[in-house]
Amino acid sequence: MSSLRLLISDSYDPWFNLAVEECIFRQMPATQRVLFLWRNADTVVIGRAQNPWKECNTRRMEEDNVRLARRSSGGGAVFHDLGNTCFTFMAGKPEYDKSVSTAIVINALAQLGIPASASGRNDLVVETAEGPRKISGSAYRETMDRGFHHGTLLLNADLSRLSNYLNPDKKKLQAKGITSVRGRVANIHDLKPGVTHAQICEAVTEAFFAYYGERVAAEVISPDAFPDLPGFAETFARQSSWEWNFGQAPAFTHQLDERFVWGGVELHFDVEKGHITRTQLFTDSLNPAPLEALASRLQGCVYQASALQGVCEALVSEFPAQAAELREVGAWMAQAVR
């Protein structure tokens, strides 16, 4: 049996692709070297320890139907579209070495006439007349007996959209997470017009084969049917869940304040693992009872727009005279946490 494995995904679903990556990584023999090539439609991918409400403009993502996907590696937030080519290299230890996979990608780009070099821990850059421009970023994960290196190559990404989804409102919240570093980036297509996703994949594949001195047929992973991978359905369910993508955020606080016709409301939330653990309420409303009840009921609530509105709606039967105010507060909170 060959020590190499080449997988290519036909899916643009980030949860599907990350689930495939996770399953292959868990189940591969320690003697195998794997190359997985894939790409995602409109997605913000965040690091394992990041807070999506801090790193992303979650409201605009929802409006534009952009998905959020939490990966199992560390690092910062990145925006993926079909102008990104994604790669994952996996190997058992002690052979796993991210400098090897970095060299394979650099060699592949060189074959396409793109002179890239490594910069810092995670990036590949190309020198231009305006200075170095980042064309690739990477992240890594290691366990006791294996490791992987995955990253993106900016082929023809819509760079104007980066700031749409990776720049949250300044006053939105204060968090204990990790802040992403946004470098100066460029598309490969601008540096070498005409290069396609298929050419990038072929070049990386050939450089992979050349380094290890053997070849293997590609396995195409299709979204039309779940891959024949043990535990894939469960892994996909977890990868696509709100609990993983949002609920795994580090603890943070969120302060909301608004003035309504009937009075001002200020709410302070402490949030852990996607649930409200503490709520403080301040208001000059002439009838604070329904708002005090709301603050109490929000303890333990999922930090999700529909859940917050649901708590307000449930209080309407107890405070029918303040139904309009409660619904107004519910809509305001829902808008604030999207």
From Swiss-Prot:
Its EC number is 6.3.1.20. The keyword Signal does not apply. It comes from the Bacteria. One of its GO terms (molecular function) is lipoyltransferase activity. It is found in: Cytoplasm. (R)-lipoate binds at residue 134. GO terms for cellular component: cytosol. InterPro entries: aa-tRNA-synth_II/BPL/LPL, BPL_LPL_catalytic, Lipoate_ligase_A, Lipoate_protein_ligase_C, LipoylTrfase_LipoateP_Ligase. One of its GO terms (biological process) is protein modification process. Residues 29-216 form the BPL/LPL catalytic domain. Pfam families: Lip_prot_lig_C, LplA-B_cat. ATP binds at residues 71, 76-79, 134. Keywords: ATP-binding, Cytoplasm, Ligase, Nucleotide-binding. Pathway: Protein modification; protein lipoylation via exogenous pathway; protein N(6)-(lipoyl)lysine from lipoate: step 1/2; Protein modification; protein lipoylation via exogenous pathway; protein N(6)-(lipoyl)lysine from lipoate: step 2/2. Monomer. Catalyzes both the ATP-dependent activation of exogenously supplied lipoate to lipoyl-AMP and the transfer of the activated lipoyl onto the lipoyl domains of lipoate-dependent enzymes. Belongs to the LplA family. In the transfer reaction, the free carboxyl group of lipoic acid is attached via an amide linkage to the epsilon-amino group of a specific lysine residue of lipoyl domains of lipoate-dependent enzymes. This is Lipoate-protein ligase A.
